[in-house]
A protein has these predicted regions:
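Charge-rich alpha-helical segments
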Residues: 1-97
């Protein structure tokens, strides 16, 4: 199981993601972002690519898709907050976008 990061670690390690449109929940339990695509097909194709990454690293997002918009949030439930797994996953998501 991954260790929950401290607020200081979260601020340092996730800083670059904030400039890319990610935001924290008020309690810093999860990080979230909304992605908007050209159409549903592009949104769903992107979700499929992300699903393969999730399976590869065995870490799965909470997400919702409405037409061309995908809302994604990341948290490590077993740890009760953000961990290195969430940081790595968010970085991989950014590479696919």
């Amino acid at each position: 199981m991954s260790r929950k990061l401290s607020d200081k670690e979260i601020d340092e390690k996730f800083e670059h993601l904030l400039s890319k449109g990610w935001s924290f929940s008020e309690d810093k339990i999860y990080i979230q972002k909304t992605f908007v695509f050209k159409n549903f097909k592009e949104a769903f194709s992107w979700m499929c690519r992300i699903a393969f990454i999730a399976e590869e690293i065995n870490h799965h997002p909470n997400w919702a898709n409405v037409f061309k918009t995908v809302d994604i949030s990341l948290s490590t439930h077993d740890a009760g907050g953000l961990t290195e797994l969430d940081l790595n996953f968010a970085n991989k998501v950014e590479l696919e976008t």
